[in-house]
Amino acid sequence: MALKELFDRDWQELESEGILFSNLEKLVAWGRSNSLWPATFGLACCAIEMMSSTNARNDMARFGSEVFRASPRQADVMIVAGRLSKKMAPVMRRVYDQMPDPKWVIAMGACASSGGMFNNYAIVQNVDSVVPVDIYVPGCPPRPEALIYAVMQLQKKVRGEAFDQLGHQLPMVDAWTR
């Protein structure tokens, strides 16, 4: 088929024959969203729930987050699970700075999102004051399904889609973004 004939045809007709039209940004965003490689920063009891999100029952690998990366240089998502002490904050910032761009952060649990239920002088009250957070997962500790939902919402954010079918941001009870 000549190139001129291809451009003269209707878009719907070409799509029905299996020819897809997109731009490079959308294709790269689709690839990034379906191959998020998380680096774990498990600090407390939320880390146990984070580990259970990869077991056979929950299987986070279905969504492209197959293996937790041991090195931040191989990861593009940091999952901060649990409380962050003020002594550990510079270490977490260093790990975040070692991640290649583009990078995203999920704050998992009440401690990572708001400092926890108890006001403690040694705990950072919001991880967002150390690194920029993209998705918050509330709960103490949140269930593995909540983390998987947050990963799915992060995939939508990476692709540049709306968060839900109604056009609203994420509900606060499940996960939310800033």
Curated annotation (Swiss-Prot):
Positions contributing to [4Fe-4S] cluster binding: 45-46, 111, 140
Membrane association type: Peripheral membrane protein
Cross-referenced NCBIfam families: nuoB_fam, PRK06411.1
Catalytic activity: a quinone + NADH + 5 H(+)(in) = a quinol + NAD(+) + 4 H(+)(out)
Gene3D superfamilies: 3.40.50.12280
Name this protein carries in UniProt: NADH-quinone oxidoreductase subunit B
Listed cofactors: [4Fe-4S] cluster
Keywords assigned: 4Fe-4S, Cell membrane, Iron, Iron-sulfur, Membrane, Metal-binding, NAD, Quinone, Translocase, Transport
Database matches in SUPFAM superfamilies: HydA/Nqo6-like
Pfam families: Oxidored_q6 (PF01058)
Location in the cell: Cell membrane
EC number: 7.1.1.-
Record-stated family: Belongs to the complex I 20 kDa subunit family.
Assembly notes: NDH-1 is composed of 15 different subunits. Subunits NuoB, C, D, E, F, and G constitute the peripheral sector of the complex.
Organism: Deinococcus deserti (strain DSM 17065 / CIP 109153 / LMG 22923 / VCD115)
GO molecular function: 4 iron, 4 sulfur cluster binding; iron ion binding; NADH dehydrogenase (ubiquinone) activity; NADH:ubiquinone reductase (non-electrogenic) activity; quinone binding
Cofactor: how and how many bound: Binds 1 [4Fe-4S] cluster.
Stated role: NDH-1 shuttles electrons from NADH, via FMN and iron-sulfur (Fe-S) centers, to quinones in the respiratory chain. The immediate electron acceptor for the enzyme in this species is believed to be a menaquinone. Couples the redox reaction to proton translocation (for every two electrons transferred, four hydrogen ions are translocated across the cytoplasmic membrane), and thus conserves the redox energy in a proton gradient.
GO terms (BP aspect): aerobic respiration; electron transport coupled proton transport
